[in-house]
């Protein structure tokens, strides 16, 4: 699980690096998706399952939502301090809880509702210094909204994965994500694609490879340990993101960011410990 958290943190850091090198977000997503499609097809062939699955409408919806959410997440990675952008992603349990209650009739516990309140307080503490000026920075506000939108999209994707988990192989669920991303990025952004230099290609390939390493490590961890423990350890990604932001992007988290992060982490970890074990496969498929 430590390897998974480190791999996903490295992936996000490379996204930020690639964006800083002038590589368009659509191109970053395209390369990531091409690598994911190739590796997913290998896994599906070994599993001897049909690559298109059974509930193709829901699978396509899961891929589409994931694509939109990924655009928002990558924009936040590039524009916000890396640790802060990563922290916003861990607000997705709030949205997942609300969506699961509405669409799946899963009633949240009092502990979960308390965690949501604590996480919202943490979000308020984290962003308050940026909003107290007469004219908050528009780029920051847009990136903040993108980060929140990415968390919402992740919540929707989690809910769809939960709906699909009873009938679809995890590799098929994962496959639909990059299957949507490849044509969508070509249609929407191919004219902006550039030919990167060596550093750019290294960053792009690293994004794809670290994504797969993170997924494989996460899946393996969830096969041998409990959902609460593995999910809790996944929050180490935030710590790794803070370290990478400090080492490579000269980003030092403010006291407000640290205080807000502490509250969000508290809410997320307690919520994870209260979740049933069947979320193992859901979490792995979502990543």
Regions found by a protein language model. Give the residues of each.
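Helix-helix packing/entry segments at the starts of transmembrane helices
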Residues: 85-91, 164-180, 215-247
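Loop-to-transmembrane-helix transition segments
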Residues: 1-4, 43-72, 141-150, 195-213
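C-terminal transmembrane-helix exit sites in multi-pass transporters
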Residues: 44, 75, 93-117, 192, ...
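Transmembrane alpha-helices of multi-pass small-molecule transport proteins
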Residues: 21-68, 153-157, 176-191
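Juxtamembrane helix-loop boundary signature in multi-pass membrane transporters
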Residues: 1-2, 97-148, 152, 166, ...
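Juxtamembrane helix-entry segments on the extracytoplasmic side of multipass membrane proteins
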Residues: 22, 30, 52-55, 128-152, ...
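Hydrophobic/small/kink-forming positions within alpha-helical transmembrane segments
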Residues: 6-10, 41, 63, 67-71, ...
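Cytoplasmic-side transmembrane-helix entry/capping segments in multi-pass membrane proteins
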Residues: 1-3, 54-65, 108-121, 140-144, ...
């Amino acid at each position: 699980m430590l390897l998974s958290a480190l791999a996903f943190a490295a992936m996000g850091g490379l996204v930020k690096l690639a964006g800083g090198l002038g590589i368009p977000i659509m191109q970053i997503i395209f390369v990531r998706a091409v690598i994911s499609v190739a590796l997913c097809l290998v896994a599906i062939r070994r599993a001897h399952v049909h690559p298109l699955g059974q509930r193709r409408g829901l699978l396509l919806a899961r891929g589409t939502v994931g694509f939109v959410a990924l655009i928002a997440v990558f924009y936040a990675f590039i524009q916000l301090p890396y640790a802060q952008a990563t922290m916003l992603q861990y607000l997705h349990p709030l949205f997942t809880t609300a969506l699961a209650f509405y669409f799946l009739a899963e009633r949240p516990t009092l502990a979960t509702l308390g965690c949501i309140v604590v996480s919202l307080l943490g979000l308020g503490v984290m962003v308050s210094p940026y909003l107290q000026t007469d004219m908050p920075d528009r780029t920051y506000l847009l990136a903040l909204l993108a980060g929140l939108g990415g968390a919402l999209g992740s919540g929707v994707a989690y809910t769809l994965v939960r709906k699909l988990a009873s009938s679809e192989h995890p590799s098929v669920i994962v496959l639909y994500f990059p299957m949507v991303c490849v044509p969508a990025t070509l249609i929407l952004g191919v004219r902006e694609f550039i030919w990167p230099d060596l550093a750019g290609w290294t960053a792009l390939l690293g994004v794809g490879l670290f994504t797969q390493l993170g997924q494989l490590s996460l899946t393996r961890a969830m096969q041998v340990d409990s959902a609460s423990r593995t999910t809790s350890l996944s929050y180490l990604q935030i710590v790794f993101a803070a370290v990478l932001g400090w080492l490579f992007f000269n980003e030092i988290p403010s006291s407000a960011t640290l205080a807000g992060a502490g509250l969000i982490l508290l809410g997320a970890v307690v919520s994870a410990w209260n979740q049933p074990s069947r979320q193992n496969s859901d979490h792995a498929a979502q990543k």
